């Protein structure tokens, strides 16, 4: 978000992001502002509707109306005007908006304080754990420290198969169920980020995924069936290699961007990277040492986001409670 000297709007408005990954994000505005082409704008003309209440109500519902089947997620104006909302009397709207303002402010303060406090306390510990893991990993993977024979392999020689993900299928579900039970893994740096689920899978064996674009070289171990999304390389090794050893070995590789301005890692380039591999017994010994160190590092690394997510869930709970109360009041009046 930037700033300019002029403005196009002045007053109370509700805006939403129309496209890309934040499509359906709702904002309450009060003051002077301008808007980009990816911003939808709604002005409340009915004096019996509180704009801030409307913003909170849309925050709860808008994401359900985002079109995620296209290549670019989008929430069009035609869809926004179709979103059904129950409006209690104006006085109740104002009270609900005030309550949610308080919860939102408190949640933001708690998250900021929590993040700052935990970051200050844990950042040194996190850096130390990361250094410990990297030190032992690099030491154990260094062939100079091995007393037994080893062999140099290109990743293409180790692989039983290597494939790259494709476009997200048109038929998917945002919720996991008996039909849509295979997560679609995106190309990102997080170990688990299941946005949607598919009926089918492309990889069912234990595998290693490597981000091929964006956060190039983010390496994760997968022990479940899944459908990879575009720019995610999936590596399934042959049985004579220990996959946990390979997971740590691939994390030590500095994968480089190739090609276009944005840069990406192709399957052909991936296969050309190489590592030294000892006997299967030695591979398992090294993995047995590095696995707990890696868990020791990642458990701490995930603690802060988990706590902040808990705060968000608390806010969502109270927001849903209030809007469900509004709907129940409407149903009671009809009966």
Swiss-Prot record:
**Domain of life, source organism:** Bacteria
According to its UniProt entry, the protein's GO biological process terms are: DNA restriction-modification system
Disulfide feature: none
Any one Pfam family match given in the protein's UniProt record, by short name: Methylase_S
Gene3D superfamilies linked: DNA methylase specificity domains (3.90.220.20)
One of the record's GO molecular function terms: DNA binding
Q: Which keywords accompany this UniProt record?
A: DNA-binding, Restriction system
Record text about domains = Contains two DNA recognition domains, each specifying recognition of one of the two defined components of the target sequence.
Family membership, please give it: Belongs to the type-I restriction system S methylase family.
Quaternary structure and interacting proteins, as annotated = The methyltransferase is composed of M and S polypeptides.
> What's its job?
The specificity (S) subunit of a type I methyltransferase (MTase); this subunit dictates DNA sequence specificity. The single R subunit has multiple frameshifts and is probably not expressed.
- The protein's name is Putative type I specificity subunit S.MpnORF89P
Q: Which organism is it from?
A: Mycoplasma pneumoniae (strain ATCC 29342 / M129 / Subtype 1)
């Amino acid at each position: 978000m930037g700033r300019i000297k002029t403005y196009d709007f002045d007053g109370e408005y509700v805006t939403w992001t129309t496209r890309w990954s934040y499509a359906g994000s709702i904002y309450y505005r009060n003051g002077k502002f301008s808007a980009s082409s990816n911003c939808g704008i709604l002005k409340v003309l009915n004096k019996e509707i509180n704009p801030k209440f409307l913003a909170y109500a849309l925050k709860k519902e808008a994401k359900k109306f985002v079109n995620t089947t296209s290549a670019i997620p989008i929430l069009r104006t035609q869809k926004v005007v179709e979103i059904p909302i129950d409006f209690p009397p104006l006085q109740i709207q104002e009270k609900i908006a005030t309550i949610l303002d308080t919860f939102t402010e408190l949640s933001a303060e708690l998250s900021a304080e929590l993040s700052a406090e935990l970051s200050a306390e844990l950042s040194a510990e996190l850096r130390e754990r990361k250094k410990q893991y990297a030190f032992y990993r690099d030491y154990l993977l260094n062939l100079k420290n091995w007393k037994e024979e080893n062999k140099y392999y290109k990743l293409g020689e180790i692989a039983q198969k290597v494939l790259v993900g494709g476009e997200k299928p048109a038929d998917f579900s945002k919720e996991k169920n008996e039909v849509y039970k295979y997560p679609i893994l995106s190309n990102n740096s997080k170990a688990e980020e299941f946005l949607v689920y598919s009926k089918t899978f492309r990889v069912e064996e234990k595998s290693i995924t490597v981000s091929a674009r964006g956060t190039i070289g983010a390496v994760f171990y997968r022990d479940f069936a899944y459908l990879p999304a575009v720019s995610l390389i999936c590596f399934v090794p042959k049985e004579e290699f220990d996959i946990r050893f390979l997971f740590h070995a691939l994390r030590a590789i500095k994968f480089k961007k190739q090609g276009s301005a944005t840069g990406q890692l192709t399957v052909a380039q991936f296969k050309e990277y190489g590592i030294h591999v000892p006997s299967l017994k030695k591979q398992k010994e090294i993995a047995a040492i590095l696995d707990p160190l890696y868990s020791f590092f990642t458990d701490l690394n995930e603690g802060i986001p988990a706590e902040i997510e808990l705060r968000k869930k608390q806010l969502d709970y109270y927001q849903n409670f209030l809007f469900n109360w509004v709907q129940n009041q409407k149903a009671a009046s009809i009966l």
